[in-house]
Amino acid sequence: MKGNEAIAHAAIRCGADGYFGYPITPQSEVIETLAELKPWETTGMVVLQAESEVASINMVYGGAAAGKRVLTSSSSPGVALMQEGIAYMAGAEVPGVFVNVQRGGPGLGTIQPSQSDYFQSTRGGGNGDYYVIVLAPNSVQEMADFVDLAFELAFKYRNPAMILSDGVIGQMMEKVVLPPYKPRKTEEEIRQLYPWATIGRTKDRQPNVITSLELKPEVMEQRNLHLQAKYQQIRDNEVRYEATGCEDADYLIVSFGSAARISEKAIELAHKEGLKVGLFRPITLWPFPSQQIAEAARGKKGVLVVEINAGQMVEDVRLAINGEEKVEHFGRLGGIVPEPEEIVNALKDKL
């Protein structure tokens, strides 16, 4: 099945309570598949096409504030419209999941694949000092697997979590093993597991208030310090990556998502030419595996960062390596996906 379809199937199977979204190419199959599967007749999961991306993210905000597993999906310009709601959720410490199947920009751009939302995703695309957890799948299998993982991390840390995919993975068809069914949590389970949730007044506690607003600067500073401490905890415990053939390599390619899949083929071609090249794939783009990249790059003749953009993750790679090794970037723009041969040529030309 397609990567987008895998998102829909996995959402139902992992006990999601609701999906609120709006169709946009190249991710429309997510909501289309959910509409075809009609989970409201089986698990009770709500599926609603909102009137806009702004409406859908605020529906997610409301559902998540009640302790529900809810998600949305969109593509680059649609996700840009959601940034206010995502910032509100981060500030109010509300867990939710959103999927970005990236397309080229800026602006309306193109419907073709891109990875140009890296900055927006890893720096917090709205206002204020906040981060969202960012998972970058490179296969249809990971599209399915990361739905439940994103929910688990979001609720563990009371923080929004993003699956940052792109049009290649979203439209690509592969075999996939779907996760086993999890039942949706009952109201009593939500009350016990998430005491912060707005589940209605009970006799044994004060009413819960979900908000990101605080007018007293001293109190707001303490809230921000609390968030920063939480982000450090996430950095310490949730870094994920995949390193292949890095130890005995002369050169290192760092890439994520579909660009990493293409880089795998490029490395096969490079090996045939006698070049010893390893691949480092960040799976969490935030928290970023800075220390692990620095260790993998140590002693290499050069590092090539391959992205389908003008050069975004390369800045984090350069910060991680801190000038110890040569770091160059190769990417294609406008929705053009690089060929493996182009990556090999860039490796030889730049390094």
Functional labels for PLM-detected ranges:
Residues 158-243:
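Conformationally flexible catalytic loops at phosphate/diphosphate-handling active centers
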Residues 29-123, 133-155:
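Thiamine diphosphate
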Residues 2-7, 228-251, 264, 268:
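Glycine-/acidic-rich phosphate or pyrophosphate-binding loops and their flanking alpha/beta elements
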Residues 307-351:
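Peripheral docking tails and interdomain loops at the edges
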Residues 132-189, 302, 342-350:
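Structural signature of the thiamine diphosphate
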Residues 263-296:
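Generic long, charged, amphipathic alpha-helical segments
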Residues 1-36:
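N-terminal glycine-rich anion-binding loops that anchor highly charged ligand groups
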